[in-house]
């Protein structure tokens, strides 16, 4: 192997990142040629252009999603993006977040990712939506920033998902998380819509769900 001296560095990067990017590898001094050589020799596999994983390492059904998220800031390591001070506002949301959180009956893909700035992508499996997500509105799942349950429920409504499906998702979230905060959910509606519209959407959702009709 022409670039055998990089094998240990690739293994180290894989150990810390799982799925890793070409730009992350470059920060560790691993050139593109070494990655190409590692693919050809069967040591690593390409998930998509610019993203790899070590062959033989534990793969996950979310590896493609992880790769897509990492490629939104390809040179940053995961631990850097997890820091509160470094929050870039890019989060997994909507139907994809619901799937990851284990609530409702939504599919993981097509992937829905919220970003503070518009991102144009040719990836038909991903829908980037311009939306502001605060750092305290997310949780991390396997290193991925995923909108919290309350935010996810709100975004499903904002994304015009079927209200009955969103109501079922709310039921699941309310049952699964004893700390689920209805007031927090209500505030998300209040922050986006005018008072009359916010009240209508929120109360319609509650009425469609199994949650006490007296809650408002």
Which stretches of residues belong to each language-model region?
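Short gly/ser-rich loop at a beta-strand->alpha-helix junction or flexible surface loop bordering the NTP-binding
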Residues: 4-6, 14-22, 31-148, 159-187, ...
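Alpha-helical oligomerization segments
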Residues: 194-201
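A short acidic, leucine-rich amphipathic alpha-helix
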Residues: 24-26
């Amino acid at each position: 192997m022409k670039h055998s001296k990089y094998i240990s560095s690739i293994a180290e990067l894989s150990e810390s990142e799982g799925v890793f990017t070409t730009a992350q590898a470059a920060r560790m001094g691993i050139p593109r040629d070494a990655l190409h050589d590692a693919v050809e020799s069967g040591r690593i596999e390409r998930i998509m252009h610019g993203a790899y994983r070590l062959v033989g390492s534990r793969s996950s059904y979310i590896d493609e999603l992880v790769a897509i998220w990492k490629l939104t800031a390809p040179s940053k390591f995961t631990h850097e993006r997890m820091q509160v001070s470094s929050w870039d506002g890019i989060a997994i949301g909507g139907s994809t977040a619901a799937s990851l959180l284990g609530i409702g009956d939504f599919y993981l893909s097509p992937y829905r990712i919220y970003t503070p700035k518009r991102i144009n992508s040719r990836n038909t499996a991903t829908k980037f939506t311009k939306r502001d997500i605060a750092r305290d509105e997310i949780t991390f799942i396997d290193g991925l920033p995923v909108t919290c349950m309350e935010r996810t429920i709100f975004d499903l409504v904002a994304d015009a998902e079927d209200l009955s499906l969103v109501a079922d998702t709310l039921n699941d979230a309310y049952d699964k998380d004893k700390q689920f905060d209805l007031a927090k959910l209500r505030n998300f509606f209040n922050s986006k819509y005018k008072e009359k519209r916010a009240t209508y959407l929120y109360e319609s959702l509650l009425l469609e769900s199994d949650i006490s009709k007296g809650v408002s």
